[in-house]
């Protein structure tokens, strides 16, 4: 997607090593490293003059929609309904002020405060986009919900997600995005795999690749047919639950502005002897195809 630095004003006294170009570059790097969910869903770029972007939700066609044709005869047309899903663009802003005195105190040889502003801004905007996307996972917002509030996660719940997605013809790759406690907590996926270390006739997970990966790296990248991800933006709620989700890429989508997802401008405030770094993210998110997602809410403590 396009990343634009907007209209920037950089004076000799306001600039940092490398100028605003370096600040934007650092922000882009931080954004791409920190973002988890956005690469897993659909994305579109809006057009100039429009504040909304539409995604098409196509009805899933079944084998029963395909007829056995007779030679040289017309087949009856099948009605395949579509629904427009709208993402409304809005601004998300973070401002970082760096005073001249603070900048001088930390130096401008690559370790200055201004030189690091881009990374701070990129991380914050990335986290906000993830937070907005995982809000779409909320229990009750989707037709299908495995496990459920107040219920501890079990392997059967993960496979139930797989069953539902396959029954609704959700295309691969399939993603499983969990909160940190859903992954590593006492009632999380890690505990389920670790608890299977002594295999029985019905419990062999601890001695397969998932158990080996967990022991060696502390993480599982593949489990039960899913690519596994975690994000701190899935937070424990007041009922001690976290709301993860199993989904195909077409389940959710987000749109960015015509100039890109992120811009950075600098503005000099001479009377205060500081430089303002303003990062703006422009996006809107929406559920696209409800049947290609399963909310996976579970008790974590």
Predicted regions and their residues:
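Glycine/small-residue-rich hydrophobic helix-like segments
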Residues: 217-266
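Extended, solvent-exposed, turn-rich assembly/linker loops in the middle of proteins
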Residues: 138-219
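Glycine-rich, charged/polar anion/phosphate-binding loops
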Residues: 38-40, 159-164, 213-215, 260-264, ...
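Long, contiguous amphipathic alpha-helices that act as assembly "spine/axial" helices in icosahedral shell
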Residues: 55-58, 81-145, 166-178, 228, ...
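N-terminal "assembly arms/tails" that initiate or stabilize quaternary assembly
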Residues: 1-85, 291-293, 298-299
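Short helix/loop capping segments that flank catalytic or ligand/cofactor-binding pockets
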Residues: 63-66, 97, 106, 185-189, ...
């Amino acid at each position: 997607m396009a990343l634009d630095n907007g209209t920037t004003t950089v004076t000799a006294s306001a600039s940092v090593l490398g100028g605003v170009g370096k600040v934007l570059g650092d922000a882009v790097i931080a954004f791409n490293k920190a973002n988890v969910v956005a690469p897993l869903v659909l994305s579109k770029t809006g057009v100039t003059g429009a504040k909304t972007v539409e995604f098409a939700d196509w009805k899933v066609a079944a084998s029963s929609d395909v007829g056995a044709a007779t030679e040289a005869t017309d087949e009856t047309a099948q009605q395949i309904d579509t629904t427009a899903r709208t993402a409304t663009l809005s601004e998300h802003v973070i401002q970082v002020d760096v005073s001249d005195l603070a900048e001088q105190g930390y130096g401008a040889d690559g370790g200055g405060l201004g030189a690091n502003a881009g990374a701070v801004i990129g991380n914050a905007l990335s986290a906000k986009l993830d937070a907005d996307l995982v809000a779409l996972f909320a229990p009750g917002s989707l037709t299908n919900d495995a496990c459920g509030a107040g219920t501890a996660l079990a392997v059967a719940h993960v496979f139930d997600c797989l069953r539902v997605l396959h029954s609704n013809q959700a295309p691969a790759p399939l993603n499983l995005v969990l909160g940190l406690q859903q992954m590593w907590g006492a009632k999380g996926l890690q505990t389920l795999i670790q608890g299977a270390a002594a295999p029985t006739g019905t419990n062999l997970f601890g001695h397969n690749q998932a158990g080996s990966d967990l022991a060696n790296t502390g993480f599982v990248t593949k489990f039960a047919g899913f690519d596994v991800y975690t994000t701190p933006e899935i937070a424990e709620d007041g009922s001690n639950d976290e709301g993860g989700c199993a989904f195909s890429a077409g389940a959710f989508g987000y749109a960015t502005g015509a100039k890109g997802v992120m811009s950075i401008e600098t503005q000099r405030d001479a009377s205060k002897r500081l430089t303002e770094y303003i990062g703006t993210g422009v996006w809107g998110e929406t559920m696209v195809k409800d049947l290609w997602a399963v909310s996976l809410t579970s008790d974590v403590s």
